[in-house]
Amino acid sequence: MRLTILAVLLLALAACARGKPEPEKAHVDVSISELQFGPSTVLEQTWLLTLRIQNPNNYDIPADGMKYQIDVNGKFFARGVNNQSVMVPRLGEAMIQVQAVSDLPTLIQHFGDLRRLSQTGINYYMNGMLYSGEWRYPFEYSGAVTPVQ
């Protein structure tokens, strides 16, 4: 009898543990919806980003933080962290406002040759991690701003 009860309990626990897919198989899509220049000093620049977090999974994600880095034309540009909580509904999306920080040498490196950038355009890439308790959701996003001909 004890063996039967133990087997039933183990099966119930296994069923609960399989309620969500493994974090490596689950993912979120994060994209930059808006970018603004924020409060800055000569040595450090703050960028205000509005991020769109899309959840293609069949369960809600109670996100409680994220970290991210932005590269421009293949080189590091800015990074940020955020500990805001946001519920990303199953098969839905949420918007969140965050900050990223760059410094003067990085800014000079990227925008020192504005004439070249106005002809070639700007390619950007963002990667990071969305946190939900002990779960981690890596993300990547890239895009380009092409010059107007």
Predicted features, each with a name:
Residues 75-109:
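Intrinsically disordered, low-complexity Pro/Gly/Ser/Thr-rich segments with frequent PxxP/GP/PP motifs
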Residues 104-149:
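Terminal connector regions
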Residues 12-15:
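C-terminal motif of bacterial Sec signal peptides marking the signal peptidase cleavage site
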